[in-house]
C-alpha cells in the first residue's frame, strides 16, 4: 500500500514494480489530478519552504530559551505553590546548570547551550508561552505534527504539500530525516492520512553518508532506463484500467505517481544528496557531524524546490532527559548549535532565508522542578515551553509570551500548538480555516476547530 512509502525512498523504488500490484484494494474515493502539481495559496505568502528542526523528547525551556533567576533562589526548595501534575513525581526547584546571556541588539537572553544560534537572535522570534494538552510523548508528538493527539490526521508537512504542491517533480515535496532510525510513533509523524498518499513524507536515515544507502533502492540495476520506462508505462495502463473499473481510487493514483517519482528521482536525487559537490569551505562551515550534514542537505533541497523538510534529533526521544540532564542537554545542544548557526548564515548569503520558514522546538518542555528520585533531570511539561521561528516573514529579535516566574506554566499570551500552526500557514499564504479537505462527511483542517494567528511574531 502507498502508505508504506512513508517508510523511505526504498518504498517508492522500482525494483519490485510488478510484485504486488494485484494486492491494491480499491477502498478510497474522490480521486484527484496530480496532488503534487504546483498550486497557488490563498494569498501571497512570505515563505515558500518550511524547515522543522524537531528536538524530539522535549528540550528544557528553562535551560535553553527561557531564563528563570527565581530557580537559583529556590534551588533545592519546594516552590511556593504546589507543583503542577505531570507524568512522574517531582520534587524541589532545580536551577539551570547553564548560564544565560543577552545577545544581539534585541538583548534577548539565551542559554550558553545555543550561543552560536543566538548570534542570529535578531532574526529569531522566541515564543516562550507554548502549551500543549498532555504530558505524554505520543499524543504530544501527534498534536505537534498532525494537529490532533488522538485521531489519525494528516501531518503538517502533508498539508503544506497538499496546499502548495512541489516546485520540483523529480524530488519528493516532503522529506524527513532522522539519524539512526525512527522517532516515537514512527511514520505516523509524517503520514498523509486521508489526504492523497503522495503528500506524505519520505523518510531517510541520515546516519548514512554513502549516497546509495541514504537513498536506497530508487534504481533497478537489472534494467536500463528505457526498459524501466516501458515497464512503468505498462503498469500505469494496468492501474488506470483498474481505477476505471472502480471509478475512484486515490491511493492507486498516488501509487502511480510514486512510481513516476521514483523513475524521475534517478536523474536528480543522487546529485541533490551528494555533499561532495559542495566547496570545502561550505562543508567546513557546517561541520562533519550528523546535524551539519542534515542541514547542508536541507539547504540543497530548498534550492531544488522541496517544500517541507523535517529534521529530527535522532531515533527514539533523545531530549527526554529524566536524569542526567546537564550532560545530555550539553551533548545534544552542542551537536545542533554550530550547524544551526551555519545553516542560518548560509541561507542569508544565498538569498534563501526570507523564503524559508524555520521552526525549532520539541513536542513539549520540561519541569522547572527535579524529577524524583534521581534529582538530576526534569519531567515532561506541557503547561509551558518554548519554540522559535525564523525566516519566511517572521519578525526577528522579539520574545512573545511568558511562563510564570519559575517556568512551569504559560501565563502571558499563551500560544497553543493550533495557534502555531495557524501562524505558520499564514506565512505560507493560507487562511488556516479555508485549507480544508472533505473526508467522511465533514471538512477537516490542520487546526481542527481552533487556532489563531500570532501576529506579534509576523514582520
Regions found by a protein language model. Give the residues of each.
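Ligand-binding pockets and gating/stacking loops
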Residues: 1-459
